[in-house]
Each structure stands twice: as C-alpha cells, then as structure tokens.
Amino acid sequence: MFTDSDAVFAGFCSGCIASANCALRRNHTSASLQAAITSFIHTVKYQPVVFALPPPIGSVMVEYTLVKQLLLLNLYSPASWPSFAVLLDGLMTANTTVIAAYVNGLLQSSGDSSTAADSGEALTGIKCSDVRPAGRATSLAGIRPVVEGRHRLSQMVGDAADYLPIECAQWRMPAREQYAGGFAGIRTRGRLLVIGNAFDPVTPLVAAQNVSKGFERSVLLKHLGYGVCSPFLPSFYPLRVVWNRIGADGSLQHSSLAQGSLCTARATRAYFVNGTLPEPGTECRVDVDRFAGNDGWDEVMSHFNTGNATATATRSVAHRVARRWEAGRHLVGMGPLESLVRTARLGVMDKL
C-alpha cells in the first residue's frame, strides 16, 4: 500500500522548490525541505503545539497524528498541494494569522457539517470483511508484524492509518463472497487495459504491474503522474472521514485522474471506443504542473472534438469531476480543525 508514498512526498518537496506557487520553497532545497517537514512532525510527536486563534475559533492543538493524517490525505491529490503548503508553512512557523485565515475559510465554506456524520463502521466493514484468517489476531502482539511492515514501507505515512489493520485483526464477520482463488493466468473474453500511476501514495505502480501480470493479454499503461484521486478536498478534512466516503458519493475514487494527461485520455478513449490497446511499455506524461492548483483535466478535454455528441458528453462529465471538490466541502463533514475547535470548548481533544 505505501510502497511509493515516500517518493510522492519527495515529489511534493521537489515540486514545491521548482514552483513559485509554493509557500514552503523559500531558503530551501528539496532535501532540506523534506528534512524540515520531517523534523516538525517529530517535534509535535512529543511536544504538541497549541495555537490560540482569535474568536470565534479559540484554541486548537496540532499533534503528531493530525499532521501525519493531513500529509497522507493531501498526497492523494496534487491539486491541493499549494493550499496545503500554505497551511503547513503556517503551522511550522507558528503563523497564527495564516492558520486563522485558513480555518475561517474552511468554516465558512463547509456549511452545516453536523449533517454529514462520520460513519466509521462502513470502512471497517468493507475492508475487514475481506481479510483472510491469516490477517486476524487475538492480541496486539499477533498483529504487530503487519503494522511494523507498513511502517517499514514508508517513513512519512506508514503509521498514519495503523487503526485499520488493528481493527481488522479483530473482525469476526468474513464476507460470504470473499474470493479465495488465485490471481494468475486469468484469461478474459476481451483484453484489459490496466492503468497505473507512477507516483501513487496508496495504490502503487507495483500493484498495477501485478494485476496486469495476472490477466493474460492485458497491457499496462504507465501514467506518469502524482496522486490517486480527483477532485481534491480541503486540506483539513480528517483521513477517516474521507476514506469512509470514498465511492459512496462519487467525490473520491482511486484512479488515474489526479493529474490530467492527453496521452492517457486518448489511450482510454481508444480502448473503449475501438477496443484497441496501447503498445506494451507505453508511458504517458501528464499535462499539468504539480503545483498548478488544479488537476488539468479542463485543458486536456479541450483537445477533444466539441461537435461530437459523445465527446461533448465526455467533456461535460470531466468538467463536473474536475469541479466536484467544491461540492465535497459540503459532502464530507467537519474537518479536524473545526472538530478541534468544537471539542476544545468542551476541554476534550478529538482523536479523529
């Protein structure tokens, strides 16, 4: 899962240094920026920071788990990287003006968050029902090797979602339709097109390669982009809330849509319209900068014939997908800072 996560984080840092649209780039190289962010995360692990923000926000606490989850969530979509860089710079420099402005913007745009409850059991039920008996355990010691294995895959985010394997280790309701067969030598009626992202924080390219190897005659197209989903959501939505909503309302999907690519779009259209596949080893570059602040799909889709009804419909769908993040502000629920604000008034910290 986290095989390429650190490479995506490195891409965030190198993209920041190369862009004028990154608040973190001043007086840094890519390596020094990585070191600075890592140092900040380690600092708040043992010394959480409390920020006293002006009314009506109040005091909020920034600690290790929050920052790790925010980092992982924002690696999902480069379209969020400029705004996340502003927020992260504000946190690292203790700039309460920047933090307050960000939180106020979030609170004003998130609407009535009380209507979007975090259905935490949904993710557990979906993922844990597919866990094989070998993934279950009766004690923390029994599941520790799995958790530690995830940590070894990624220094930056390997421990950002430890709750999931620990919860699944105790799950006692396996799905009836759980697949117990193999994934090799599968021959489908039609040949499959498999698309894998080169820099994906949670569904790495090696997984796409394994899928392609399992399906005979399939072709893997390597999408040379960062991230895993589009549209993006505001930086402070909690990781568990977002994961619980993936696929439920169409606002997030694991896909190759995080960065637009005319090459990938043409290959996908050729497959669905004509049944043709790209040549083995095909790689498609993306047509948007990592810190552009958008996913680039509007520009990509402008290359398709607007007079053709099918192309027009395709552009319409792509446009709605590219803009769905605005609706996502109202669909997903309160963000960590907003929940921190509410619970701080009660003297209780929200553990997300």
Residue ranges and their predicted role:
Residues 1-352:
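C-terminal subdomain of alpha/beta-hydrolase-fold enzymes, centered on the catalytic histidine
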